[in-house]
Regions:
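A short glycine-rich, Lys/Arg-flanked "PGG" loop and its adjoining helix->strand segment in the class I
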Residues: 131-143
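C-terminal alpha-helical "lid/dimerization" subdomain adjacent to the S-adenosyl-L-methionine
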Residues: 6-7, 150, 154-205, 209, ...
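A short acidic, Gly/Pro-enriched loop at the edge of an enzyme's catalytic core
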Residues: 106-117
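Core SAM-dependent methyltransferase catalytic element
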Residues: 209-231
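A short SAM/SAH-binding and catalytic strip from SAM-dependent methyltransferases
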Residues: 116-130
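Conserved alpha-helix/loop element of class I SAM-dependent methyltransferases that forms part
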Residues: 27-48, 63
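Class I SAM-dependent methyltransferase SAM/SAH-binding core
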Residues: 49-107
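N-terminal, positively charged/glycine-rich alpha-helical extensions of SAM-dependent methyltransferases
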Residues: 1-20, 168, 179
């Protein structure tokens, strides 16, 4: 089931105040390390300009501030997620380094070849038009720049895949029913994670969108994956 941009916007608006808390529970805090891995990968390019697409509450955008002399822009379709992110940025006194903008990943309002690094953390599967969104990322990425994507994936190992399916069907639904004001949002996120192409299938889509030298780094036995692609 694919949701429209308006539905995605409304869904994330409804869970904006609980998103960080539940993300910590659902990933057992693992997302923090994986986002640190994104920064480590990005640092290799010595980037000056960084775009974090689907920035949400700005976790990754804020982490990028660890890279000296970098200017970071985060965009997201959800105004309320951005409000949470802006508060975090203000609390860390990073307003001069990290700027958040309401924007659409499939229609980026930036010049071509503008960014040394583009990141997308747990957002690419929510693109209404995946290929269009990836081609827009390719357009605004500078030559030799890197696209770094962190996304949920389904483990290839049968045992881990079985555990993953039980975990998503039982644990995530239970936790969201207890703590979330909109449990249906997490049901959608769980289903979209299972239906999204991962591994080699997603690599083919990245290559078709113009990227090259795609590398895959599975996390937590393949329950999440970092994809690194070059322009």
């Amino acid at each position: 089931m694919k949701l429209s941009k308006n539905n995605i916007n409304s869904m994330f608006d409804s869970i904006s105040n609980e998103y960080d808390f539940l993300n910590n529970i659902i990933t057992f805090g693992g997302h923090v390390k994986w986002k640190n891995d994104i920064v480590k990968i990005a640092r290799e390019n010595n980037p000056k300009t960084i775009l974090d697409i689907a920035t949400g509450t700005a976790d990754i955008a804020i982490k990028f501030s660890e890279i000296e002399n970098s200017k970071i822009i985060g965009i997201d379709i959800s105004s309320k997620m951005l409000d949470v992110g802006r508060e975090k940025i203000q609390n860390k006194d990073l307003a001069k380094r990290v700027v958040l903008i309401k924007g659409d990943a499939e229609n980026l309002e930036f010049d071509s070849d503008s960014f040394d690094i583009i990141s997308i953390g747990y957002g690419v599967r929510n693109f209404e038009n995946l290929e269009k969104g990836l081609k827009e990322s390719f357009r605004v990425l500078a030559p030799h720049g890197k696209l770094i994507i962190l996304e949920t994936s389904v483990p290839s190992n049968p045992l881990f895949r079985f555990i993953f399916n039980i975990y998503t069907k039982v644990f995530i639904r239970l936790i969201s029913s207890i703590f979330s004001k909109n449990p249906k949002a997490y049901t959608y996120l769980e289903k979209s994670a299972k239906n999204f192409p991962s591994g080699d299938d997603f690599t083919k889509i990245l290559l078709k969108s113009g990227f090259k030298n795609v590398k895959i780094e599975p996390k937590l036995f393949g329950a999440s994956t970092i994809y690194i692609a070059t322009k």
